[in-house]
């Protein structure tokens, strides 16, 4: 497995090249310019301004209260700290309820620096993906455990277990790519299933709690640094600052572990 090093800003073609080369893609969240600079300088390829900010920054119990205004503010902050990494941004809860509404929400995010929009779920969201892609907006499709669906799921639970559920998730992944998604994010999915999906599709997959078979990995920065968000710590989280050191060192250690395949290991992985 090659280790991808990129001295140029990340782009959609660079993502496709990484998939072809078998080079692991490193992704982390950021919510302000200071941390964004650290990520950008220490091996992170994609920076995600996630609606997870609702839980780790604002102190909510879920991502549901996060607004488009919140996302625009934090995206603008992060964009000021990013030079090389690609900036991916969540559409918050119900901002993608229709194609037109999604475009309305995505536009101010793109104006302040977003380079790709992340959308949770499948089903009617396929129409949203197509609508945005037709308007030259790159889209990341977030499948598996989608935190905006926490009320329907009844909590934060592993998705895709069992033959029927696994088959449905594989079909959703293929449909998202057919709709035009440039990137897939798979959350809390059995590692075997995530590896199958990664083989199924032509675009890169980024895993969080989805095993080492994905094309890349993402974590919430606060989790990587062992910061207490007031919520139970998921199995897939590893504290890269547990033994001391600096934030920059922890980010570099994470990036290296993703690229050499040592993270995630079995301890941080779900099975069928």
Curated annotation (Swiss-Prot):
It catalyses: 3-methyl-2-oxobutanoate + (6R)-5,10-methylene-5,6,7,8-tetrahydrofolate + H2O = 2-dehydropantoate + (6S)-5,6,7,8-tetrahydrofolate. GO terms for cellular component: cytoplasm. Pathway: Cofactor biosynthesis; (R)-pantothenate biosynthesis; (R)-pantoate from 3-methyl-2-oxobutanoate: step 1/2. This is 3-methyl-2-oxobutanoate hydroxymethyltransferase. Its cofactor is Mg(2+). Homodecamer; pentamer of dimers. 3-methyl-2-oxobutanoate binds at residues 51-52, 90, 118. The keyword Transferase applies. The keyword Transferase applies. CDD domains: KPHMT-like. It is found in: Cytoplasm. Binds 1 Mg(2+) ion per subunit. The active site is at 187 (proton acceptor). Catalyzes the reversible reaction in which hydroxymethyl group from 5,10-methylenetetrahydrofolate is transferred onto alpha-ketoisovalerate to form ketopantoate.
């Amino acid at each position: 497995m090659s280790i991808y090093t990129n001295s140029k800003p990340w782009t959609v073609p660079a993502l496709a090249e990484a998939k072809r080369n078998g080079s692991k893609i490193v992704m982390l969240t950021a919510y302000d310019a200071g941390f964004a600079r650290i990520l950008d300088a220490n091996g992170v390829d994609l920076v995600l301004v996630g609606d997870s900010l609702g839980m780790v920054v604002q102190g909510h119990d879920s991502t549901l209260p996060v607004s488009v205004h919140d996302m625009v503010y934090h995206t603008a902050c992060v964009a000021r700290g990013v030079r090389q990494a690609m900036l991916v941004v969540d559409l918050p809860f119900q901002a993608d309820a229709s194609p037109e509404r999604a475009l309305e929400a995505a536009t101010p995010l793109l104006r302040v620096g977003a380079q790709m929009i992340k959308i949770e779920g499948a089903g009617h969201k396929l129409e949203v993906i197509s609508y945005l892609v037709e308007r030259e907006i790159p889209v990341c499709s977030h499948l598996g455990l989608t935190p905006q669906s926490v009320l329907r799921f009844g909590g934060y639970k592993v998705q895709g277990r069992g033959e029927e559920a696994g088959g449905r998730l594989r079909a959703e992944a293929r449909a998202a790519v057919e709709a035009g998604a440039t990137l897939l994010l798979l959350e809390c999915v059995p590692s075997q299933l995530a590896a199958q999906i990664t083989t199924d599709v032509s675009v890169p997959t980024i895993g969080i709690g989805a095993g080492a078979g994905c094309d890349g990995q993402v974590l919430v920065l606060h989790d990587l640094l062992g910061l207490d968000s007031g919520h139970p710590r998921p199995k897939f989280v590893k504290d890269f600052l547990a033994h001391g050191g600096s934030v920059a060192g922890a980010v570099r250690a994470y990036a290296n572990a993703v690229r050499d395949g040592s993270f995630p290991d079995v301890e941080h992985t779900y099975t069928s």
